[in-house]
Amino acid sequence: MKTAAYADYLIQWLENQRTELYGMDGYTLGVSGGIDSAVCAHLAARTGAPVQALILPAEVTSPSDVADAQATLESAGIDGQIISIAPWYDLIMQQLSPVLNSEPERVNVLKGNLMARLRMIALFTTAQSHRSIVLGTDNAAEWLTGYFTKFGDGAADVLPLAGLRKEQVFELGRYLGVPQSVLDKKPSAGLWAGQTDEAEMGVTYAEIDAYLRGETVSPQALQQIRFWHNRSHHKRMLPPKPKSPDEAEC
């Protein structure tokens, strides 16, 4: 990858999407303290358009993640707001508790997905208020495996990193000046305390990147990649719809 040239391409691509496709005034994104949102923040800052950045911690969010998110905004030259989603989360879980499945294996994923969807609500509400578009942070590895929450962090107006392997996101981050603390940390969606992407998926980003490069990976890695890809087709498509009565000849 010609890193500098691709960074320039993405910056211009973002501006083309914002002005020509959407006709909006700026960008809105959530900054988690991770590499993907850090790269998106730096790209958005370099467009010169207004950027609304939100840090949206939950009760399980570590203070170091918040500190890394703040460092990201400082390095990108962006102002941001810290708004806790914990009160919204607690209220919804309390109100829905009578109808939720209490089986332990469902609980962590359910809670994590709710946090992602609450962040989506915050981002799109802010974006609408400022006539801006929401930047998604999914990279090619996450898109392949469906490692994002449907209608949560998977909901966005544009996905500038969707063509980049995880290794390329890090390469772009180093070029753009993402803080070293962000570059050094293990990727995590922050869905629960101690959670990491690779432990949850059972496959490393290095293995997924190798697969995306067309290289041979271990049988175990291939099995996990196919497992996650096959069970997440619905995340990469619009909801299916039936034929109309005329089309169905009914």
Curated annotation (Swiss-Prot):
GO biological process: NAD biosynthetic process
Pfam families: NAD_synthase
Family the UniProt entry places it in: Belongs to the NAD synthetase family.
Keyword ATP-binding attributed: yes
Enzyme class, broadest EC rank: ligase
Assembly information from the UniProt record: Homodimer.
Residues given in the record as deamido-NAD(+) binding sites: 117, 150, 157, 234-235
Pathway: Cofactor biosynthesis; NAD(+) biosynthesis; NAD(+) from deamido-NAD(+) (ammonia route): step 1/1
EC number(s) per entry: 6.3.1.5
Residues that, per the record, bind Mg(2+): 36, 142
Purpose: Catalyzes the ATP-dependent amidation of deamido-NAD to form NAD. Uses ammonia as a nitrogen source.
SUPFAM superfamilies: Adenine nucleotide alpha hydrolases-like
Listed GO CC annotations: cytoplasm
HAMAP family: NadE_ammonia_dep
Organism: Mannheimia succiniciproducens (strain KCTC 0769BP / MBEL55E)
Protein name per Swiss-Prot or TrEMBL: NH(3)-dependent NAD(+) synthetase
CDD domains with a match to the protein in the record: NAD_synthase (cd00553)
